[in-house]
């Protein structure tokens, strides 16, 4: 199956990434993707864009040459209380909100602390997707996190980049997460976590994890633009007429 949706991509606004939105649109067209999210790092990261970058995403077109563009963020989980570095009414202006642990903002601690912080983030209602929860630097109680995510309709990400250039040793955790989410009745999404446009829509290793865990296709948000957009609507984001053309994909 070809997966037409990518929820996790960084642009040159995060200065350790190397591509523009134009670059991503070009690659999306070449690869046949229909929808992707621009999710630069939240402002508490040292090289992240300013808060205003996210506020001003309203200027981004929803569609370019038939490619849908979601306005998003990969926010930073800041503490055990599940606070993130983007807040208030500004969150409502974004189409999609991802959040995860990043060492410069939340240094690795212990399993109990990581689990509490992740569950608090899930319970906050502010975050749609938890990124790279299988990172071995941040051990968690996988079953508890999967159950909380299912209860609160938050998706957990299987992050393809975790099997390539970063977060080495994630495979076992990610398989366990996929199985736990399966058992809890929750949702998964694959993210390329692209920091350069060529890797947009690259899910090769994540697909192997999904298959190993025998995760059901109908609970994988990448399966179609409609699946992701319906999920975001259920999460309280606005349904946008501009994306209606994508719902036939």
UniProtKB/Swiss-Prot annotation:
Which residues are Zn(2+) 1-binding?
8, 10, 74, 193
EC no. given is 3.1.3.-
Binding of Zn(2+) 2, residues: 16, 41, 195
What name has this protein been given in UniProt?
Answer: Probable phosphatase Swoo_1706
- Requisite cofactors: Zn(2+)
Under PANTHER family, the record lists: PHOSPHATASE YCDX-RELATED
Pfam families from the UniProt entry:
PHP
Q: Tell me which species this is from.
A: Shewanella woodyi (strain ATCC 51908 / MS32)
Task: Tell me which family the UniProt entry assigns to this protein.
Answer: Belongs to the PHP family.
Disulfide bonds, paired cysteine numbers: none
Q: Name one GO cellular component term.
A: cytosol
Q: Which HAMAP family match?
A: YcdX_phosphat
Q: Which UniProt keywords apply?
A: Hydrolase, Metal-binding, Zinc
């Amino acid at each position: 199956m070809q997966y037409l949706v990518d929820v996790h991509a960084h642009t040159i606004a995060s200065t350790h990434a190397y591509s523009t939105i134009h670059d991503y649109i070009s690659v999306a067209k070449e690869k046949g993707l229909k929808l992707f999210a621009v999710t630069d790092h939240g402002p508490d990261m040292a090289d992240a864009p300013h808060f205003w970058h996210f506020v001003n995403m309203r200027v981004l077109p929803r569609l370019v040459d038939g490619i849908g563009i979601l306005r998003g963020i990969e926010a930073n989980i800041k503490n055990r209380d599940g606070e993130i570095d983007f807040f208030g009414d500004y969150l409502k202006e974004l189409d999609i909100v991802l959040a995860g642990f990043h060492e410069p903002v939340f240094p690795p601690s212990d399993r109990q602390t990581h689990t509490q912080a992740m569950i608090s983030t899930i319970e906050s209602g502010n975050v749609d997707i938890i990124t790279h929860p299988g990172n071995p630097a941040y051990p968690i109680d996988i079953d508890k996190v999967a159950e909380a995510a299912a209860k609160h309709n938050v998706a957990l990400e299987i992050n393809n980049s975790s099997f390539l250039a970063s977060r080495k040793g994630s495979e076992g955790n990610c398989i366990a997460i996929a199985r736990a989410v399966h058992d809890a009745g929750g949702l998964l999404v694959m993210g390329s976590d692209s920091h350069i446009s060529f890797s947009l829509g690259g899910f090769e290793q994540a697909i192997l994890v999904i298959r190993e865990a025998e995760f059901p296709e109908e609970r994988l948000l990448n399966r179609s633009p409609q699946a992701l957009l319906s999920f975001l609507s259920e999460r309280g984001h606005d349904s946008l007429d501009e994306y209606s053309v994508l719902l036939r994909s």
